[in-house]
Amino acid sequence: MTKDLLLELGLEELPAYVVTPSEKQLGQKMVKFLEDHRLSFETVQTFSTPRRLAVRVKGLADQQTDLTEDFKGPSKKIALDAEGNFSKAAQGFVRGKGLSVDDIEFREVKGEEYVYVTKHETGKSAIDVLASVTEVLTELTFPVNMHWANNSFEYIRPVHTLVVLLDDQALELDFLDIHSGRISRGHRFLGSDTEILSASSYEDDLRQQFVIADAKERQQMIVDQIHAIEEKENISVEIDEDLLNEVLNLVEYPTAFLGSFDEKYLDVPEEVLVTSMKNHQRYFVVRDRDGKLLPNFISVRNGNAEHIENVIKGNEKVLVARLEDGEFFWQEDQKLNIADLVEKLKQVTFHEKIGSLYEHMDRVKVISQYLAEKADLSDEEKLAVLRAASIYKFDLLTGMVDEFDELQGIMGEKYALLAGEQPAVAAAIREHYMPTSADGELPETRVGAILALADKFDTLLSFFSVGLIPSGSNDPYALRRATQGIVRILEAFGWDIPLDELVTNLYGLSFASLDYANQKEVMAFISARIEKMIGSKVPKDIREAVLESDTYIVSLILEASQALVQKSKDAQYKVSIESLSRAFNLAEKVTHSVSVDYSLFENNQEKALYQAILSLELTEDMHDNLDKLFALSPIINDFFDNTMVMTDDEKMKQNRLALLNSLVAKARTVAAFNLLNTK
């Protein structure tokens, strides 16, 4: 016989960004609890609102499954003494399992007999097991916790109610300072405390109190209501997924409505209006069917449609206050002079250990010119890079960006165009922030990409130079994101610039404001970002092998990893890797530089390998390179089968090591083959 279990935790309002991850976590913790305690079940369903986290288990067994376990003990010769009685070792073993020597039997394992005991454990009732089910709540982890009242414990928010039901039976349990029952809280304004009659009636009981407990249902209600408004008003609404997920975790009973604002604000840049609505007010942006921005918005109320007209007016009033600010800054900022703003950046701190933003820009200007040369930009593009690098942070001192910091770069582009800057310069000001996330949009222009690279390189090298190096998950200056942006941009634009050479040359630049340091740590940090770009689906040994190659060109490293993944499926992969690995391992024994002396060869296999290496021409096609290297496998194996590399003749030994080293020098441009696993 099975039953349904309900566990609901009622809390004060949770931050929206915490709700969905916590709901998912709760489901996972419950599944683990049931599996660890041998309670079988059919399904686990989770629920969440800003004021509750809940999980329901359907088809829960009324008793644990019985457990039978075999335990292996000491060998028979240790388990029995000279008289054939059980030794202290055997007695201690069975006692530790809660059994006696009468339970011992001997089983043969690989030709030797060992003590074995079998332990049977009858399953407990579900009621007894569930006495500790609040463990799943204790084990939840949150980004931040808090104290309340005089309690010593911490949790994400103060806890008010705990409901634990097995079908319609309320279980009496305690969590923190709360005793469980069947009372849950309804909507803060429209509902009241209510009894949950049974685990199966949970959603319906709360619905009567204006709470939609199922987040998916709540989300669909919002989407359906928005679509209904779209149809009625003949408009188009951008349903941004991140905004939708945030809004559904701000409300327990959603009602969408259409608001409006004065058309005069449409003269303000669209990005300002969208940021005001979406980022600051959590409103959905409204356009006409052709995509033109309209003086409207859609918001979602936490409640029903009663007195909705008052809610609409209140939301319109709040939005207009923000739009007034945007309009004011738009007009005032146009009176500013870019040169004056750049000069004022001397007084703005980039970081107290590194210097001012002006000094940061000064270094970026030099780096960008070097990069523009390496990337073979045209003279016109180089001039645009130089100009952009000279001014690109000016918008940080505008009123608009001070109020709406999400618009940095975006407003820089607009103000630059208004000031008569070239479109390429203006676009670069916006694009230098890209990508803004691990998989975010990349710059579209070469000028913008070079400026983005220069800005990110100086940021990375500057922070590392003063010892501000990320550790663990701690990365307050977003250096991982910046470095990920570097490798993505280099790969996307096909700039095959070796990163080791690039970083070394950057360290060779001279600045009055800062001396770069910690080059080795920087290279290791960059390698870690390339490994992340390769992806965890590529086996670890392949990732390590290509990162230890002598190729520091991002695109070639990525191609080599894919080529090895593909080759690893071939029948000849194992034997080819093993022969190359043997060559790599022996080449490590080279103690000093020696040229290969053909006259010292003693057999045809040495000569054949020598000629094969001379003929080996590797290109930037990593798939073709692997074909060529794998084709050498029979020749390499013949060499090893017929040649003693580590001979007593020192001259002969060094010559053979030099021969292998010449092979390894070429092969290492693809990967460090001795790091590849063939087992």
UniProtKB/Swiss-Prot annotation:
- Which catalysed reactions does the entry list for this protein? tRNA(Gly) + glycine + ATP = glycyl-tRNA(Gly) + AMP + diphosphate
Asked whether the keyword Lipoprotein is assigned, the reply is no
GO CC annotations on file: cytosol
Q: Which UniProt keywords apply?
A: Aminoacyl-tRNA synthetase, ATP-binding, Cytoplasm, Ligase, Nucleotide-binding, Protein biosynthesis
GO molecular-function annotation terms?
Answer: arginine-tRNA ligase activity; ATP binding; glycine-tRNA ligase activity
GO BP terms: namely: arginyl-tRNA aminoacylation; glycyl-tRNA aminoacylation
The record's EC number reads: 6.1.1.14
Primary residence: cytoplasm
Give the top-level enzyme category. ligase
Q: Pfam families attached here?
A: DALR_1, tRNA_synt_2f
Q: Where is this protein found?
A: Cytoplasm
Subunit description: Tetramer of two alpha and two beta subunits.
Family, per the entry?
Belongs to the class-II aminoacyl-tRNA synthetase family.
Designated name of the protein: Glycine--tRNA ligase beta subunit
